[in-house]
Amino acid sequence: MVDNKDFNEELKENIQEELDNETKAENPNIDEEVEEVSEDIKADEKVIDFEELKALKEENTMFKSKTKKLENELEALKDRLLRISAEYENYRKRTDKEKERIYTDACEDVLIKMLPVLDNLERALAVDGTVEDLKKGVEMTVRQFEDALEKLQVEEISTENGFDPELHQAMMVVEQEGAEPNQVAQVFQKGYKRGDKVIRHSMVTVTK
């Protein structure tokens, strides 16, 4: 008995073979045409690959160009930073020297005005005389010292307008009959200022 499955397979193969033969009979060049189509497809694939490669090369060239441009810009920024750093360092050195010169000149100016006061004090100590003579010498030296402070634009801090924490330092608070509160009752140590700059606060007692 013949197997139906094998019979069907054999029948399909026979039919397919007959169809192929009929196709070849109608189109004797079918194999060549199929081969040409295959060659065209392969050629198209090569063209596609070439175009993609060309695009990649162009993209790579553009990337290299941008990279080179960025590298040049980076080098320019580095050079600029180095120049600015060098200029700042030179400026700092010049500023330090200028500050030192100003400080030295200021100290020299103060000493020039104060040394005569020291000279007079030394002369007063060297002279033999009465207490009155010594007192007169000290008074003269004090006046000379005050003149030197005036030339330096240094003035004594006033206490006439009452206690001011910006100018005075309260040592204690006292009761004083007939005095208004927050007034300077006594000055323990005078204060001095130059312009708006307080050199030394006045040490005072303040009324309640």
UniProtKB/Swiss-Prot annotation:
Residues 29-38 have a biased composition (Acidic residues). Pfam families: GrpE. The keyword Transferase does not apply. InterPro entries: GrpE, GrpE_coiled_coil, GrpE_head. It is found in: Cytoplasm. One of its GO terms (biological process) is protein folding. Keywords: Chaperone, Cytoplasm, Stress response. Coiled coil: none annotated. Gene3D superfamilies: 3.90.20.20, Head domain of nucleotide exchange factor GrpE. It comes from the Bacteria. Residues 1-38 are annotated as: Disordered. Residues 1-25 have a biased composition (Basic and acidic residues). One of its GO terms (molecular function) is adenyl-nucleotide exchange factor activity. GO terms for cellular component: cytoplasm. Its main location: cytoplasm. PANTHER family: GRPE PROTEIN (PTHR21237), GRPE PROTEIN HOMOLOG, MITOCHONDRIAL (PTHR21237:SF23). Belongs to the GrpE family. Homodimer. Participates actively in the response to hyperosmotic and heat shock by preventing the aggregation of stress-denatured proteins, in association with DnaK and GrpE. It is the nucleotide exchange factor for DnaK and may function as a thermosensor. Unfolded proteins bind initially to DnaJ; upon interaction with the DnaJ-bound protein, DnaK hydrolyzes its bound ATP, resulting in the formation of a stable complex. GrpE releases ADP from DnaK; ATP binding to DnaK triggers the release of the substrate protein, thus completing the reaction cycle. HAMAP family: GrpE (MF_01151). This is Protein GrpE. It comes from Clostridium perfringens (strain ATCC 13124 / DSM 756 / JCM 1290 / NCIMB 6125 / NCTC 8237 / Type A).
